[in-house]
Amino acid sequence: MRQRVMIAMALSCNPKLILADEPTTALDVTIQAQILELLRGLAKEFRTAFILITHALGIVAGMTQRVHVMYAGRIVEKADTVELFANPKMPYTWGLLRSIPRLDEQRKEKLLPIEGLPPDLISLPPGCKFEPRCQYRRDICREREPELIPVPNAKSDHEARCWGTQNVSGGGWLVDTDYRREVGDMRVLEEIKQEVASIHTESGPMTTA
């Protein structure tokens, strides 16, 4: 109910843009689906744009057109949703996708977490903020922070903040290409969309943005 009241308050001034910070936090899956459907209906009826801040990859896959991935207060990768899920170019993004359970596989091993802890925002390191936790780090990552630059040969507007993406021919930082394909697979995005749709059982079918 509180989320609905806040949405009503936000719409009272007929805004063109609404910033929704974790709009489904602490909700069960049924109420979560109803809130998401409400946001989608408002966007369609009033032509209101939404910026969703969320840690839920299912919401990202089912609700967004473009994604900005942030780490330690910085944008580390941005692309349209399909491109990002199919072709992640920053190790942090790749790590997030590795943590998604695959619905088409029977996993014998545990999901792989991102090791380590986020940096102290009061005393950030001079180089890449993800470097202490990155398994593909190199010396330059510790020394200087890379810029957010276009990914070579991307299918859409795609930028990443990673020295590996900039320096490797064609863009990319993974050596094990077979493992890379396992993560950057379009099935991952489709599975998340199906999972989001499956929880929407009371307020009608959910369409995907």
Predicted feature residues:
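P-loop NTP-binding/switch modules centered on Walker-like glycine-rich loops
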Residues: 15, 19-23, 27-109
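Short, flexible, glycine/charge-rich loop motifs used to bind or transfer phosphoryl groups or to couple energy/partner
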Residues: 8, 41, 57, 118, ...
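Short glycine/serine/threonine-biased micro-segments
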Residues: 6, 18, 24, 114, ...
